[in-house]
Each structure stands twice: as C-alpha cells, then as structure tokens.
Amino acid sequence: MTTTTKPKAAYWIIAVIAFIWNVMGVMAYLAQAYMTDEAKQLLPEAERTLYDNVPAWATAAFALAVFGGLLGALSLLLRKKIANLLFTVSLVGIIVQMSYNFFISNSIEVYGPGGMIMPIMILVLGIFLFMYSKSATTKGWLN
C-alpha cells in the first residue's frame, strides 16, 4: 500500500485548468482532422495549402499531444501516477508536431511571426504539465 498526501488547492486549480486546456486541444484537433472541403475553401489559399499538405505523422503527433494531455489531466484529477507518463506522451507529440510546424512546413511564412505565439505557449504548457505531474508524484499527491 502506498502513502499519499493531500494536495493543496493550487493542485486542483492547475488540474482543472489543464483539463479544460486539453479539451480545447482535442476540439482543435477534431476540427482540423475532420475539416470539410467546404470549410477549407473558406480559408486563404496559403492556409488551405498548409492543411492539405500536413503529413500523417504530423497529424498523429497532434493527436498524441492532445489526447495524451487530456488523459494526463484526467489522471491528475483522479490523482493517478500515470499522469506523468501521459504528459510525457503529450510532450513528445507536441515536440514532433512543433518541429514539423517550425522547421518543415512554411507555417511561419503563412502566419507570420505572430503565428508562433500559440505554438510556443503550447510547448511551454506541455513542459510545465510534464514537470508538474512529476513533482506531484514525488510529493506523494498521486497514487
């Protein structure tokens, strides 16, 4: 039997925010993965070309990032140690996806420097949630 300690209020706030954030990520993934041709036609041509040329491995990385993050956040809410593994999977997905966006595709040309703000924020939050879940495990908050 393992011993756990009770987490502070900040833990629950972070876990709820992480859950909401990752629900939004799943919604963004589903919107992109299942975007209809009619919806794509409403995009500027450069954006439409970006969407049409995303390789399957980058889409898979996006899916791993958001679904791993959602399950990790749910695990935080349930105080389960698997949260750290799930946030690790999510972070790997984020890194792979962002590597494609920054270094392989021409998304920076299409969206401009301002288009880097959200991806950088996603990466920072992914690192934070990975480190936070590891810390929560060390502190005995997760079982």
Segments (PLM) and residue ranges:
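Topology signature of small-to-medium multi-pass alpha-helical membrane proteins
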Residues: 1-143
